[in-house]
Each structure stands twice: as C-alpha cells, then as structure tokens.
Amino acid sequence: VKAEDDTMMDAFKTGEINFLSQLSEGDQINTALDMAETGEFNYCHYTRNGYGKLMFQCDGGPTQFQAVRQAVAYLLDREEFATTFTGGYGSVVHGPYSTAQWMYQDSEEFFNDNLNNYSYDPAKAVEVLEADGWTLDAEGNEYSGTGLRYKEVTAEEAGDYALNVTLADGRILMPLHIMWASSENNPVS
C-alpha cells in the first residue's frame, strides 16, 4: 500500500501501514522521530540518495544568457530553502548529486574548493545582469529600477520568444521575464 503524504503519519500510527521510507520534509521527519521516542516505533537514519534541482531551458528567452542563470542562482537563498524544507535535516550541494553518492563523497573537497556555490547575494545578481546588458526599460531607455529589465538582442538571440519588443528603430528588446514551470504535488513548487 502506498501511503499518501497528507495521511501517512496517521496511517502509520494506526497500523494501516507499518513502514515509512524516504521522508525528506522536516515536519514528517520530526513527527516520525516523536513517534519513535514513545518506544512503540523504531527508526533507521541514513543519508538519502536524492536531491532537488532548478533546471533551465537554455535554448531561448532570457535563460539562454548565462548571466540570467547566474543572477537567479544569486537570488536563491539555498541554505535557507534547504533548512526550511528539510527542517534542518538536509544540506546544499552544488551540482546534480547527493551527499550519499560515492562520487560526491570522494570529491567533496574538490567540489567545495572549485565550484561557485552562488551564495545568496542580490547585489551580485544585479551586477551580473547589468554587466550583461540588462540595463533598459521597455522603451529602450535606461532602466529606472522599477518594472522589468530589458536587454537589446540580435534577431538570432530573440528567436521566437513571444515577449520580445521591437522598437520603431528596429532594435529588439528582450524582457527579463522567465517562463517558469514546476513539478506537481511538490511542497516547494
């Protein structure tokens, strides 16, 4: 029987199910540990071989530009996110691997020393965007600090991105508007 996330703890308490695995949300883990403290249940702690990720479609729109992807990374407080989601039971990794995987364990020092961990830094996000040309408004004037940022792009860079603006002088401006998608039935989506 597969337990549903919103009822699995009650089903476990009542004996409807007798095993829980792969708990990753802090509230679930705390509830399970509280139940184990009563002595009625046992638990086994292990490093979970899983991870979450943010993925970009990089063949068009603003995310084709490395600076935009970097700015998004600087705007995510990944430490706070991991702590909030896992209740302090998770950690941040800087690539598509988990701390349970041997290749991470064998290379943890190298990863920590050589990969940019993109610590939360909104000022750095703005700096990266401005250096890449995201300095205009929708009319092609200097960005004032409110509304969307735009960048002048070539026709090739513009592609078929539906939100581009073509000015009377023929310049093409791309708005810094990212079309997001997310997985369903996910507490962080």
Feature-to-residue mapping (PLM):
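Short, polar/charged alpha-helical segment
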Residues: T31-A32, P187-S189
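Append "and occasionally in soluble cytosolic enzymes with long acidic Gly/Pro-rich linkers
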Residues: Q64-V188
